[in-house]
């Protein structure tokens, strides 16, 4: 192969002259020529369009929108639930207020004729204020429960226990009960006094029946 790159020697030159290399032969016998990078590739001959070349990721196909889109419920319809609505608090409040106010008003009625009219009128005005605040939702649950206990003690003539509940309400809930609790306190005192008088009258009525007349012996 080396002989291909060497020109034939000059006959006129000496035997020891260096050979002359032929660069033209090197370029002619070199490897296959490369296509320049700037040269465009010819379009295909069949005429079919070429797909555009993209360097990004392939597009993602989105599913078509569902035809059964959620729609709001029609007007006037409510979702069906298995929970029953709670009982009306108004009815429960009216029941409790009658359980408390009715015994107090009855106790005030018992005091008429034994208590001064001015005192009875003041107690009646305080009880009316209690009813108004109770019905208007201005009293808390603890106050209502303690008033129910106070009435029970009053009905059983447990005056000291009723008075203790009255004092606890004045200490713990003075802002709620201060306007009408004075009348309840006075009613407890008047009812206690009336009960003591009735007890004395009963005792005075029973004692003469048990007394014996001197010198008179009751038949056995």
Swiss-Prot record:
List every position bearing Phosphoserine: 48
Q: Where is this region: Disordered?
A: 1-89, 194-220
Q: Which GO terms describe its biological process?
A: apoptotic process; negative regulation of myoblast differentiation; regulation of transcription by RNA polymerase II
Composition bias (Basic and acidic residues) maps to 194-206
Location in the cell reads: Nucleus; Cytoplasm
The record's keywords, sorted A to Z, are: Activator, Apoptosis, Cytoplasm, Nucleus, Phosphoprotein, Receptor, Ribonucleoprotein, Transcription, Transcription regulation
Q: Which family does it belong to?
A: Belongs to the SRA1 family.
Q: How does it assemble?
A: SRA1 RNA exists in a ribonucleoprotein complex containing NCOA1. The RNA also forms a complex with PUS1 and RARG in the nucleus. Interacts with AR.
Please report the name of this protein according to its UniProt entry: Steroid receptor RNA activator 1
Annotated organism of origin:
Mus musculus
């Amino acid at each position: 192969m080396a002989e291909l790159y060497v020109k034939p020697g000059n006959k006129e030159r000496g035997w020891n002259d260096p050979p002359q290399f032929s660069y033209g032969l090197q370029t002619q016998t070199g490897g296959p020529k490369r296509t320049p990078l700037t040269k465009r590739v010819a379009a295909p001959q069949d005429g079919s369009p070429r797909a555009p070349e993209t360097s990004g990721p392939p597009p993602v196909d989105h599913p078509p929108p569902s035809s059964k889109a959620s729609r709001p419920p029609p007007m006037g319809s409510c979702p069906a639930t298995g929970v029953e609505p709670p009982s009306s608090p108004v009815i429960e409040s009216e029941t409790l207020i009658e359980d408390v106010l009715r015994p107090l008003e009855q106790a005030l009625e018992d005091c008429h004729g034994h208590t001064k009219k001015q005192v009875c009128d003041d107690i009646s005005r305080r009880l009316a204020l209690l009813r108004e605040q109770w019905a208007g939702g201005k009293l808390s649950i603890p106050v209502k429960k303690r008033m129910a206990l106070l009435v029970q003690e009053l009905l059983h003539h447990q005056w000291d226990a009723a008075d203790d509940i009255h004092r606890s309400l004045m200490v713990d809930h003075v802002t709620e009960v201060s306007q009408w609790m004075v009348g309840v306190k006075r009613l407890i005192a008047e009812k206690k006094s009336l009960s003591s008088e009735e007890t004395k009258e009963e005792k005075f009525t029973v004692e003469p029946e048990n007394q014996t007349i001197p010198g008179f012996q009751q038949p056995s």
